[in-house]
Amino acid sequence: MCGIAGFQGGFSAGLLARMTAAVAHRGPDGSGTLLLEGEDGAAPTGLGHRRLSIIDLSEQGRQPMAAPCPRCGSAGHADLALTYNGEVYNFAELRRELRAQGHVFHSGTDSEVLLHLYAEAGLALPERLNGIFAFALRDGRAAGRPAGVERGDVLLVRDQLGIKPLYVAETPRGVLFASEIKALLQCRELPRRVDPEAVYQALAYLWTPAPRTALAGVRKPPPGTALLLRGGRIAREWRYYRLPYGQEPLAGSSAEVAAELRERLEGAVRRQLVADVPVGAFLSGGLDSSAVVAMMKRATPDARPRCYSIGFRGGVEMEGAAPDLPYARRVAAHLGVELHALEIGPEAIGELERMLWHLDEPQADPAPINALRICERAREEGMKVLLSGAGGDDLFSGYRRHRALRAERAWGWLPALARRGLAAPARALRAGRNGGWMDNVAFRRAAKAFAHADLPADERTVAYFWWNDVELRRALLAPGPRAAVDGHTGAEPLLASLAEIEDERDPLNRMLFLETRHFLADHNLNYTDKMGMASGVEVRVPLLDLELVDFAARVPSAYKQRGREGKAVFKEAMEPLLPRDVIYRPKTGFGAPLRQWLRGELREAVEETLSERSLASRGLFDPAAVRRLVELERAGKVEGAYTVFALMCVELWCRMFVDAPPPAVASEPAAAAVAAAT
């Protein structure tokens, strides 16, 4: 696990050094740069790397890794060159295969396997990999290149599920790429312009769907994407992997599918335990993290894995949710693992600027602060790898919106006019025309469930991911940005993704596809990776092992949702390993009591960040509309806490990524403005 940076085009060695230094936090164990002049008129290429050593801790694992062609016997020192971030879990199997073909290896790293495999597979290389990765591989061979590859071309790849981040920017001088946006901003000719469409989408979802980012000149390739750089331009871009929804569902009973699921999860955890450093885990006491820890214990019965959990000081918890720590302690005692519990309070929100600096994007969710605290504690105690339970809700149907989708069976058959009769009053209630009832959880959820009843089926599915209605977020924009998104609802990128699975007509599976394709890749996995790397910790996600994901896509939706019971087959699979009260406990989000904090300890921070002066100067949001939203939220008349938080995050992000000059060496904000206001 590392940080990468680089370019193809007419850039300098100084820029490469600055870009690599900007991701220094991702790799405290070593660094390297490699500048390769173009042969035969090819554009120069710069590769930078920061190393977090996990497998083969020796100097042989240093990157960028350059080698003669392992297949053609060339004497060229840098026929092939690689900068790589991630882990390939099937690297040992691939290395055995390559050795049988005559390849000779000089290290125990998965990085070297990539170079050798490219020599055999060419552009089909990423299709052979099961892992988490983003890498750039330059082919400088005079001969023996794959079809469609010219000398000096660079293959740029992001893993199948978007577990590792990758950002790309095209400039007149060439293409820049890196693990984080802050590295790209070391190029002073890259414009720091906000993309109003991306901000509009961030208000809707609290995150921005790929390929956009909040910076107009920077994009993130979707999961499973490969790009071929040539002459300082993107010569080709293609998707080498698509989520396999729309296939024939698995045959067999629920019990048989549960048994196979249990076996596949154990295999995934065993693959992801491979490391030359200690491996621990997140443990919330929820089903997903508990299942991962149970499989860790099954794979290493004599070990006591170190696990980490978090709770809120003073008994304050997520609204409408049971506390996690009692369940985490119950699981730890049941499995015989070591639990390290952290407790935080409202002061944790003082980490907001630091969180946003590491996220690179204005994601409006306090959950990354929890992940950051856990990863920092783990690293202080010598841990370099943590396993996470991310992905279980997305693959097997664990979110409330999945139940709401199922509930549509009771009214979805109604004609359009009748559905409009449900939607109009629900939207009016959500817009503030109620008696302060939005503080009531049940009322709030019911209003949201019917607010988009009049939309077509796919648009209705997308709307379950929204945190506010179209009318509100349009009103929040200043006139210029509002004109830029005229005619758009924010649903467009997710609707475009749904077109990838035209053969999948099951409504639940279509929603689960969006969970994995966007909510995971653009939100959960982005913050999981970056909070871990901010702390020098690699976070692995066994539930998103490629073989397990392909299996989950074929599990019948009737086995995922049984009545109001989500993740039914997953729960059935874990019954032999975990206590029933843990398996069937109420769902708890990995977040924070944001409504209480915004109205209490964060009140002054809201006033400062969203002041009329700040907003008018920025020109993104309408100050009067924002003021009205803040007042309605405090009165309990709108479900607006996360929208207010999104507005704050966009403004704070702009101060760091748009206003501030690019530092020579990136450094975290020394003191957050939010912290000063609290």
What is the predicted function of each stretch?
Residues M1, A43, Q186-C187, D195, ...:
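Adenosyl-5′-phosphate
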Residues G6, L98-G102, L185-R188, E248, ...:
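Short amphipathic alpha-helical interaction patches enriched in hydrophobic/aromatic residues
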Residues Q160, R373-N434, E459, N524-L548:
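Active-site adenylate/phosphate-handling loop in enzymes that bind or generate adenylated species
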Residues L283, G389, L520:
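Conserved S/T- and glycine-rich ATP-binding loop of Class I adenylate-forming
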Residues L356-H358, R400-A407, A664-V665:
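Short secondary-structure boundary/capping segments
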